């Protein structure tokens, strides 16, 4: 858990030290770059704190998860809107394949949007070049299936089994490339299960990952 906070704090400290350097302070472009770094790491820490609180409340059954009939395609569109700026910054694309004819489920709009945003952010984050993401929906019996597919780094079989654990990190052999999903995917799993659904991942190293969510439709 400490790693989730130590890394951004260390980055912020390094950036502050760099800005204090007399040679750097006169270079507006570099100062702006370091300030952006501080801003990004601060946001990252804030997100981790939010996730800690969410998981804690979930475990104590204190999180308000009131559910209402909702059109899943609307939730997906909302989640995509949330990540659009990050995606545009990386010149990435999201291609939608909405094949589900029945799409109304009993969900908590806020938490289910967070679930999809989390998976989309990971898809963008772990795409080494320009992110190319695909979102699919389909109906299987009385369920809706949502698939979010990326063409990024992919993950090992071990990582696929453990990726929904709190603070699981996959060591790739490169000290500078330790992939951490933090609390995000643990939160995803708890929320999906609270919606009587399932979430799992299919992945291959170097070929990308597909996160699959199944939740029941309203009959």
Please annotate each region the language model reported.
Residues 40-45:
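Short alpha-helical segment of the dimerization/phosphotransfer core of two-component systems
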Residues 60-65, 104-107:
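Conserved micro-motifs of the catalytic ATP-binding
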Residues 86-96:
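Short conserved segments within the C-terminal catalytic ATPase subdomain
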Residues 123-124:
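Short helix-loop "hinge" at the ATP-lid/N-box region of the Bergerat-fold HATPase_c
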């Amino acid at each position: 858990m400490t790693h989730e906070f130590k890394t951004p704090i260390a980055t912020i400290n390094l950036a502050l030290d760099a800005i204090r350097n007399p040679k750097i302070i006169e270079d507006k472009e570099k100062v702006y770059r370091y300030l952006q770094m501080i801003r990004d790491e601060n946001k990252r820490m804030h997100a981790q704190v939010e996730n800690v609180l969410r998981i804690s409340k979930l475990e104590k059954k204190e999180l308000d998860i009131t559910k209402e009939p909702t059109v899943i395609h609307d939730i997906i569109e909302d989640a995509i809107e949330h990540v659009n700026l990050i995606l545009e910054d990386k010149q990435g694309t999201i291609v939608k394949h909405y094949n589900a004819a029945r799409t109304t489920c009993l969900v908590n709009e806020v938490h289910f949007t967070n679930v999809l945003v989390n998976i989309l952010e990971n898809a963008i984050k772990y795409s080494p070049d320009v992110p190319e993401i695909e979102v699919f929906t389909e109906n299987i019996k009385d369920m809706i299936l949502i698939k979010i597919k990326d063409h990024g780094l992919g993950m090992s079989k071990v990582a696929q089994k453990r990726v929904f654990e709190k603070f699981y990190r996959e060591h790739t052999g490169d000290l500078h490339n330790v992939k951490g999903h933090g609390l995000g995917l643990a939160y995803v799993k708890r929320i999906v299960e609270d919606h009587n659904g399932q979430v799992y991942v299919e992945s291959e190293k170097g070929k990308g990952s597909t996160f699959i969510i199944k939740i029941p439709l309203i009959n």
